[in-house]
Amino acid sequence: MNSVSTSAFGPVAFSLGLLLVLPAAFPAPVLPGEDSKDVAAPHSQPLTSSERIDKHIRYILDGISALRKETCNRSNMCESSKEALAENNLNLPKMAEKDGCFQSGFNEDTCLVKIITGLLEFEVYLEYLQNRFESSEEQARAVQMSTKVLIQFLQKKAKNLDAITTPEPTTNASLLTKLQAQNQWLQDMTTHLILRSFKEFLQSSLRALRQM
């Protein structure tokens, strides 16, 4: 899938991302990576909710690409043949046929629940990514904050909130401690696998959301 570049992840975009996740500010008129003229231009048609979510996901994907670039440049993890060893120790969310997000057997309600649940499950892994980058610290934070905003938008779209599973805080805390206690090689590999899996999950989510 070709990601469309939307905006550079600079300090301004990062600060905007932080503002958007404040409860008092939600829903905000402008999403990260979104120009205010896209929302309220006097002589143009404002973006629909679906279009804004689409653009927001592509913004996050751009951030993931920047983080993966740094990861690949500083290590050989992107080419490693030992990925399976580390991947077996992770429980990263993935799309399956039963989730109703694929073209065959598509089910909007079931799929939306899966997307939201998956994003909630990814949050602990996005927390792990914080402080894992030297030159892209703001990008890592922006991806994390923008994902929180995306979850809030999708929850407003969902009809069956009771079906959404939220990870237990104690479970997440235990997992985070375990991941941070790994040796350097495994931490680098975990970072690579999280970014790759999150990219794949968002791409699948984007394709599914375009059918809704």
From Swiss-Prot:
Cite the InterPro entries for this sequence: 4_helix_cytokine-like_core (IPR009079), IL-6-like (IPR003574), IL-6/GCSF/MGF (IPR030474), IL6/GCSF/MGF_CS (IPR030473)
A molecular-function term among this protein's GO annotations:
growth factor activity
Q: What does UniProt give as the signal peptide span?
A: 1-27
Q: Which Pfam families match?
A: IL6
Q: Matching SUPFAM superfamilies, A to Z?
A: 4-helical cytokines (SSF47266)
One GO CC term, this protein? interleukin-6 receptor complex
What does the protein in this record do?
A: Cytokine with a wide variety of biological functions in immunity, tissue regeneration, and metabolism. Binds to IL6R, then the complex associates to the signaling subunit IL6ST/gp130 to trigger the intracellular IL6-signaling pathway. The interaction with the membrane-bound IL6R and IL6ST stimulates 'classic signaling', whereas the binding of IL6 and soluble IL6R to IL6ST stimulates 'trans-signaling'. Alternatively, 'cluster signaling' occurs when membrane-bound IL6:IL6R complexes on transmitter cells activate IL6ST receptors on neighboring receiver cells.
Assembly and partners are described as:
Component of a hexamer of two molecules each of IL6, IL6R and IL6ST; first binds to IL6R to associate with the signaling subunit IL6ST. Interacts with IL6R (via the N-terminal ectodomain); this interaction may be affected by IL6R-binding with SORL1, hence decreasing IL6 cis signaling. Interacts with SORL1 (via the N-terminal ectodomain); this interaction leads to IL6 internalization and lysosomal degradation. May form a trimeric complex with the soluble SORL1 ectodomain and soluble IL6R receptor; this interaction might stabilize circulating IL6, hence promoting IL6 trans signaling.
Q: What is this protein called?
A: Interleukin-6
